[in-house]
Amino acid sequence: RSGRSGSDATAIMLAKFIKADECIIYTDVDGVYTTDPRQYKKAKKIKKIFYDEMLEMASLGSKVMQPTSVQDAKLNKIDVKVKSSFVSKSGTLITNSKKAFSDQIITGISSTKNDAKITIVGVKDRPGVAASIFKPLSKNLINVDMVVQNISLDGKETDLTFTIKADDLKKTEKLIKQNKKISFKKLSFDKGVSKVSIIGVGMITTPGITYRMFQALASKKINILVISTSEIKISVLVSVKHAKRARSEERR
């Protein structure tokens, strides 16, 4: 099938229906790259990638496939080959099979361009406050990404920082200020931020990746604002003016 999103989902659904082992998606790119090849000439095409790695890259902005299509393929154990409609090249295989995988630790690097950071200063440090803050955001379909809560020194008040899409900033500010279930001392916003992430299943069994990432950023005097980690992803929030440099450092 050609195209993205709906046609990808249709192709995977048909592959499931006929019990196919593999689904080939023809699109306008010749595979999945370690980072955006339009911005970084040294980006490398990935021959094989795990479903979970592809899910992370798709959720962070890779437009090769939609996250829902990757998830459907994973759930139905269908290997997906991404190939170009215009050139005859091998493409990228999305799979869970460990056969023929290299020992590469980091599979891909992604960054976002449309994030905003919100810090609520001096909220009450008690159970249910975070839920009270995020409930109206959820009802208004505002996606909250990175979340950090400071340790309360006095057990009375704390600060809560989280990120959202910059397009949702005004609505979020309004919802927080209208929320009668919480009280706080100050609300601060920063639209000039970008999330830079490294993704790789190999990080699960490789010590020192976090240190190396942070050391690389420190060597270029790039300050980290927020940190978020999972088994196969490490994300940092940095000033948007440092995002491209940070992404270049993580490629080393």
Give the label of every model feature segment.
Residues 1-252:
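C-terminal catalytic "cap/lid" subdomain
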